Amino acid sequence: MLNKIVIVGRMTKDAQIYEKEDNKIATFCVATERNYKDDNNEISTDYLLCKAFGKTATNIEKYTSQGTLVGITGQMRSRKYEKEGQTHFVTELYVETIKFMSPKNKNNETPSDNQFENNTYQPDDLEIIHI
């Protein structure tokens, strides 16, 4: 089985950054367009919740803001939680790689590849299968 997602889209707002057990985590939403128009002749948009960890989260914090065009590869994950007696389901894109494709950061610069910090953190529940 394969769980590999590739998207290109724009960040809908600045990433939310927090730390858990000494690891930085970034959560953000990316808007992507579908390749067809709806009944009103308008292009439909999907909004994907994304989550990144470690150095990738640090780079997202440094080099992105609302409107940044990004290319992402990763895995879709679903989870559920209880809140006030109701079960909620969430589907998230766990970021493996991200490419910043437009200069939307505070300095209006796009970082070069050698400016990125290497990411070595993997979340505990991320299963890596080597073929």
Curated annotation (Swiss-Prot):
GO cellular component, one term: nucleoid
Coiled coil regions in record: none
SUPFAM superfamilies linked: Nucleic acid-binding proteins
Biased composition (Polar residues): 104-122
Keywords per UniProt: DNA-binding
Pfam families recorded: SSB (PF00436)
InterPro entries: NA-bd_OB-fold, Primosome_PriB/ssb, ssDNA-bd
Highest taxon listed in the record's lineage: Bacteria
CDD domains per UniProt: SSB_OBF (cd04496)
Protein name per UniProt: Single-stranded DNA-binding protein
Gene name as annotated: ssb
